Design a protein with these regions (language model features):
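TPR/TPR-like alpha-solenoid signature
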Residues: 21, 53, 74, 89, ...
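N-terminal signal peptide c-region/cleavage motif recognized by signal peptidases
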Residues: 14-16
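Hydrophobic face of amphipathic alpha-helices that form TPR/SEL1-like repeat modules
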Residues: 20-27, 39-43, 54-61, 90-97, ...
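Sec-dependent signal peptide recognition
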Residues: 2-10
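Short helix-capping/linker turns of helical repeat alpha-solenoids
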Residues: 28-32, 40, 45-48, 61-63, ...
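Terminal, low-structured helical/coil segments at or just beyond the last alpha-helical repeat
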Residues: 122-154
Length: 154
């Protein structure tokens, strides 16, 4: 298959999902949180990381749903496992503060480290900040987890 044809096929497959995501975003921006939630939830059920992160954000701030840090963490985790950088950053923040998940600096450092490796300067700063609350053994454990994730992603 030529590169042009492969790109066209990828666009044809991604097109409807992208349109649905944009429809949900438009609904969200207009304050129609119910429609946004329904659209993103349908996409998230299909494994769309952007939609999973969007649902997490709705639960994080309580936009159209009850604020629920636990549900936010669940949705962020699903997106983060797919490599979504913002989800990784936000999941790391939840672990560092213990909101919705037990406080766990190793997990926080790992998720922030993965986001930092994707170019997030904020995640890199936050990782450095929480490292002051960690032992050297915890930092080494978190670094090992980061390497394991990066190896799996290759």
């Amino acid at each position: 298959m030529t590169k042009g044809l492969a790109f066209a096929v990828a666009l044809a497959v991604a097109g409807p999902a992208l349109a649905d995501f944009q429809d949900a975003l438009s609904a969200y921006d207009a304050g129609d949180y119910e429609t946004a939630y329904e659209e993103w939830h349908a996409l998230a059920q299909e494994g769309d990381a952007e939609a999973e992160a969007a649902l997490a954000g709705m639960h994080l701030v309580g936009a159209g749903v009850a604020q629920d840090f636990g549900k936010a963490a669940e949705w962020y985790r699903r997106a983060a496992k797919q490599g979504h950088a913002v989800a990784r950053l936000n999941l790391g923040e939840l672990y560092s503060t213990g909101r919705g998940v037990p406080r766990d600096y190793v997990q926080a450092y790992m998720w922030l480290g993965l986001a930092a490796a994707q170019g997030s300067a904020w995640a890199d700063r936050r990782r450095a900040e929480i490292s002051w609350s960690m032992t050297l053994a915890q930092i080494a454990e978190a670094e090992d987890l980061i390497r394991a994730w990066q190896t799996r992603a290759k």
